[in-house]
Every structure is written in structure tokens, then in C-alpha cells.
């Protein structure tokens, strides 16, 4: 169970809509209640959806900062599907036009190999076996599901490592775009951080760990450096020590 709960640190700190927040909370409740009730098969399905949510949040961040590469990766899709993927206003809409196994292809944009993608997506095949009538219970004891969760968490950490340059770029863009207090959406730094860093980019605590390593001194000559420093301090104060 402890390994499973660690996934929470890889999921967004908070969500921009109540429906998204309630959806993720529902998945956690479904996982924990079924795990506690020893209904491990159903617990695994809920955890799989949490895992796929993590993947979709990562792809969302890639889409934001590698927009042209993301467009190039859509070659071969129908025009309608391509348009909907580009126009998606939430990561959850990716699955309206993508099969779960297809979404992993976008991780190649951050240097993941075909072998990596195969490891990341293998859980989809296992889930498909569980989600259809088979006459067999795959996860019938705690040892089996704990091993599966540990395997999934290894891949979560692997994806997170590959995502670090993307996260740093997300953060740098936020600091620069929001540095001018007269031009940004919210004058109050806490509100600006929540809306345009956390919510817009679906930022997690693990993402923030990477953000906290960012050296803002490289922007010391920027006309709005005080704004950059204020935002960086705000992020550190609110989330950096959690």
C-alpha cells in the first residue's frame, strides 16, 4: 500500500476544475477500499487509471513546451483526431481520440526508446485481460498486487526522470511569462502560482522538486527579475518543503 500511495506525489497538487479533482479522489477511494477489502482485482483497475492519469499529465506538459514536436508526432492520425488532440483543453480529453497504448508514443519526444515505451505500456495489456471476462482472477492476494504496483512505480519514476527537462522548461516559462505584475493574470503571487503554474501545467510535488533546483540567477539582468524572485520564493514557501 505504501508504494501505491507514493503515486500521489506524482499527481497534480490540485486541479483547475472540481470534476477533475473529484474524479481522481474517486479513483483513490476505489483503490483503497478495494485493497482494504481484499478485492485486489478491482483495486488494480483503479490504480491503473491513476497510473494512466499520471501519463496523460506528462504528455500534457510535453504538448505545452514541445508543441511543434507534438504536432509532428501526430503524423498518420486522421485530421479530425489531430485537431481534437491539439485543441484538447485538458489531459483527460486525449483518450477521446487515443487508445491507452497509443499515448505512450509521445514519450519518445523526451528521449524514451521503444524498449522504454514497451515497459511503460505493458500494464495496458495486463489491464485489458482483467477488464474482460476470462474466468481467472489475476490478482488474488496482496503479494501479487503489491508486486504489480512496485513494478508500475518503477516505471512512473523512470518517466519522471525523463520528464525533468520538460518540467524545468515549464517552470522557466512560467517565471518569465508571469514576472510582470502589471501584465500577468493575478497580481497576488499565490494566486498566479496556483492558476498558471499548478493548474495550467498539472504540476505535482515531484515536479516542484525539479522546479526548486532551477537557478533563477540566470535571469538577474531581466527587467522583471524581482517578479521572478517573488514567484520562485512563493513556490518554495507553498510547496517546496512539503
Residue ranges and their predicted role:
Residues 18, 106-173:
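Charge-enriched, short contiguous segments at helix-coil
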Residues 49:
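Gly/serine-rich nucleotide phosphate-binding loop at the start of the catalytic core
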Residues 22, 26, 98, 122-125:
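Generic alpha-helical secondary structure signal
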Residues 1-5, 143-242:
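Terminal, compositionally biased low-complexity regions
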Residues 1-46:
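Charged alpha-helical initiation segments
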Residues 5-18, 52-112, 133:
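Short non-catalytic regulatory patches outside canonical folded cores
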Residues 40-44, 55-67, 139-140, 165, ...:
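Short, solvent-exposed secondary-structure capping/transition elements
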Amino acid at each position: 500500500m505504501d508504494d501505491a500511495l507514493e503515486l500521489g506525489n506524482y499527481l497534480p497538487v490540485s486541479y483547475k476544475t472540481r470534476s477533475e479533482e473529484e474524479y481522481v479522489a474517486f479513483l483513490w477511494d476505489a483503490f483503497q477500499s478495494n485493497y482494504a477489502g481484499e478485492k485486489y482485482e478491482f483495486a488494480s483497475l483503479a490504480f491503473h487509471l491513476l497510473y494512466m492519469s499520471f501519463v496523460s499529465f506528462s504528455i500534457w506538459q510535453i504538448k505545452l513546451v514541445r508543441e511543434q514536436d507534438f504536432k509532428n508526432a501526430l503524423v498518420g492520425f486522421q485530421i479530425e483526431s489531430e485537431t481534437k488532440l491539439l485543441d484538447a483543453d485538458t489531459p483527460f480529453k486525449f483518450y477521446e481520440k487515443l487508445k491507452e497504448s497509443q499515448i505512450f508514443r509521445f514519450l519518445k519526444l523526451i528521449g524514451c526508446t521503444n524498449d522504454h515505451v514497451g515497459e511503460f505500456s505493458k500494464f495496458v495489456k495486463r489491464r485489458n485481460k482483467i477488464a474482460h471476462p476470462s474466468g481467472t482472477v489475476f490478482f488474488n492476494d496482496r503479494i501479487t498486487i503489491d508486486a504489480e504496483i512496485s513494478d508500475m512505480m518503477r516505471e512512473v519514476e523512470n518517466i519522471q526522470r525523463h520528464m525533468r527537462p520538460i518540467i524545468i522548461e515549464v517552470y522557466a516559462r512560467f517565471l518569465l511569462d508571469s514576472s510582470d505584475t502589471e501584465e500577468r493574470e493575478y497580481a497576488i503571487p499565490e494566486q498566479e502560482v496556483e492558476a498558471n503554474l499548478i493548474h495550467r501545467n498539472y504540476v505535482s510535488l515531484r515536479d516542484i522538486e525539479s522546479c526548486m533546483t532551477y537557478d533563477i540567477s540566470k535571469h538577474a539582468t531581466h527587467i522583471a527579475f524581482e517578479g521572478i524572485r517573488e514567484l520562485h520564493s512563493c513556490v518554495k514557501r507553498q510547496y517546496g518543503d512539503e
